[in-house]
Amino acid sequence: MQIQKVASDQMPPPSGEPSPELAHILRAHADAYMQNHPVGSQQGKIFRDIRHCRTPSLGVHLETCGIGCGYERVSFHSCRNRHCPKCQSLQKARWLLERSQKLLPTTYFHVVVTLPHELNPLILRNRERLYNLLFEAASKGLSELATGWKRLGAQPGFTAILHTWSQELRFHVHLHMVVTAGGLSLEGDRWIPAKNDFLVPVRALAKMVRGKFLDGLQWLFEQGQLTFSGNIAGWRNPVVFKRLARKLRRMKWVVYAEPPFSGPRHVFSYLGHYTHRVAISNQRLVAFDGQTVTFRARNNEQPGSYRRVDLPALEFIRRFLLHVLPKGFIRIRHFGLMASRNVQTKLEQARRLLQASPPTTQTRPTKDHRITWQQLLLKLTGIDPT
């Protein structure tokens, strides 16, 4: 892999060449990849869907002018696969339209919980179980710390979004959580705001997440519900597994919280940035010469700048497949006040309390929930579906 730093994210393809897309890469190399690597039915379907998305092979529909001017426009059908970078804008717009009606008029924190890379070999063989375990450990840890901690002592509401990739498409499992800066009192009679831009102590949260995750991992091991194969086949030995667990308990797990957003409008925009993102968007692809894929990645050493990453096409496809979600897996989940069982009760009570009280409310809910999804799609993405 070669990495070249550049000063900005504006890295167009060479003059005269079309912008590369994931579909172009898969059309050129997916068959060769499948000949040399085991590919399941779900991965094969992803290859087919993305390669044929918005092409004549999926069919077309004809749009005509309703007042008889004779104008016609042919549009190719989309594949609607959740892993297709072309098919996320509409899903995102619809989701944001629905969520905008449930946001509370308060500030929000962004909390990120990351799993140690030492777990990657085990996660790759047990994706669904361990992704679920991460959601459980993070949500319970945050909820218990918020409700029991003396400086808050309230139930917050939060949305958690699973991402599995780094900027270079490596396997990097982490949760993004958008959390209300405060919560409903345990008695349900008042809103308790977070004090001094401080939600909960992140070190304590990291320890709680670590403990809950490793306790759950131990239970899965004892129940024989973990798969061990290939170069981790030896991990099924209780002595070896215990050694791994002990090592993980001694490690500092990465959890951080960013300063709060200024209100629902900002968190609405932020959620749109993270929710329906796939591992690689077409906008990040810079060049494809038939053999090498070049894409841009953030340069953490120089904030605001980007670097070029060059990968052989087959390695690029391998990394892309690392981030295929289990079939039917729910990667966006809601907890606390945002949980479905609380939406009609505790969430509405919190909304009434916030709208009745002064300065803790930064802004009223936006008017975005009153526009159509077509208007919202245009606002968020610049795509006009009409």
Residue ranges and their predicted role:
Residues 1-386:
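Beta->alpha loop/short-helix hinge microenvironment recognizer with preference
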